[in-house]
Amino acid sequence: MKPTLRLLTAFLFVQPLVLAQQAPQSVPNAVSVAGAATQPVSGGPINIGSRRELFIDRLLIERLDNASLKLHEPTSGGVVIRIDKPWEGPGNFGMSVIELGGRLLMYYRGWSLSDPKDQNGMACVAESRDGGVTWTKPALNLVAKPEWPDNNVIATEDGVPRFAFPCAPWVDTRPGVPATERVKMIESMPVSGEKHTAMRDPVGPKRLVFWASSDGVTFRKLAPQPEFVSDLRNSFDGGNTMFWSEAEQQYVLYYRFWDVSAKAPSADVDRLGGRGYRSMARTTSKDLMVWTKPVPMSYGNTPREQFYINNTQPYFRAPHLYLAPAARFMEGRRAITLEQGASAGLVNAIGSAKIDWTRDCSDAVLLTSRAGATAYDRTFMETFIRPGPGYGNWTSRSNYPLTGILSAGEQQIQFFVSRHYLQKSWHVERLLLRTDGFASVSVPWAGGEMVTKPVSFTGKSLEINYRTGAPGFVRVEIQNSSGNPIPGFALADCPEVIGDEITRIVAWKQGTDVSRLAGQPVRLRFVMKDADLFAMQFR
């Protein structure tokens, strides 16, 4: 591939924002970010307050005996949109899904690949009015083109379809944001003035430009214009996410860059020259105007991998927890032959660019982080969203999640994934998962237990999200910080909890009231059999 061709990397976008620089912000363990569970340097209890805690990492866990942390894969909710418009085509790509005004809006790039001069496509929108089950493409006609009747292309106020690379609209939830600026979007521009396209990533610093909308379809530039310039190599080439953090009380931006501090295998070579990893940096702002110095995210003591899109976002039921269903790109890892790719209808050229789109494969993994942290936790290295059967799922840059984890009712959550990239069979699939059910403390039939580190809490009762088999159970003992049962809350005082419930209040012989223990350092001992514990919360 020619050096100027960066292989469409930027079509996944997540909530981003822009910055001017201020001192770097790093939140060590000693700092208790509002809404975040942190371990004081003094070794005192972890203050979880009344927040819901999911078992997506080991922060709260002291000991696992015949128990393990288990990642749970989503199930398919069916295909929700396909290529069916003349302005769409094999270059379609999923961006983000938001909830606005009682409906869901899904943003995706429409790119027919029929015009050699068009190296970006354009941002389109679909909508669902039944909670994500069925989707339609509204006839917006914001862009006046006779060959695009009843088109669903989003645009500027003057009808220009300039958005597509990269832009992922997101809802700004900061209190006091004007209704006219509730939906925001960014685009990446080289400082040099060169055009940043899906097929060309100019060398040099890049900046983000902010747009806003009241309805999620017509956008105008913010004024005054926030701006963040990054000189990290290959900044913003897809995979940018941004949101207002309720836990941190500030805007947080995660954006992609090329990390040359760690040398990747020879197959993973930057098209701009040099070996490195597609990675993420984090920066924050109170007002969108002044931003902290970007800090590259770390990944703990785990093997480095290529992350095309990060999709980092607060979990709506526990906003201090940041979940990132990230697109993992296995560059140079071939699963199918050229002939098999051709049989799937794979496009082998974009304009004059001849590319072997069968040489790579992709899936999605679950990265997690917490408010204020500059590291991703990689408790789970295995695949979260699998490619699945069929040659079409084993081509380069397929299986990339869209930004957005949303409710699908009390029992389930939903998110979406882009399949069959650069094929006429491209589509977006709806995925479903148990509410809070990304991972669990899982115990087999033989039985086992999990004991937490010392924690302090506020509230009157302990709520759990759990499931058991017919012979299974969950029982809870509350201990003092030394590990001794507190009278009235010993294991023998807790009847077996049996069933499958998103919400269950734990009871002991004396009842459910735990308020006399609030504010004290305690340990929780969960003794289980044939059971999964997904989350807990004091309320």
Where are the predicted features?
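Sec-dependent signal peptide recognition
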Residues: 2-10
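Carbohydrate-active catalytic/glycan-binding domains of CAZyme proteins
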Residues: 22-539
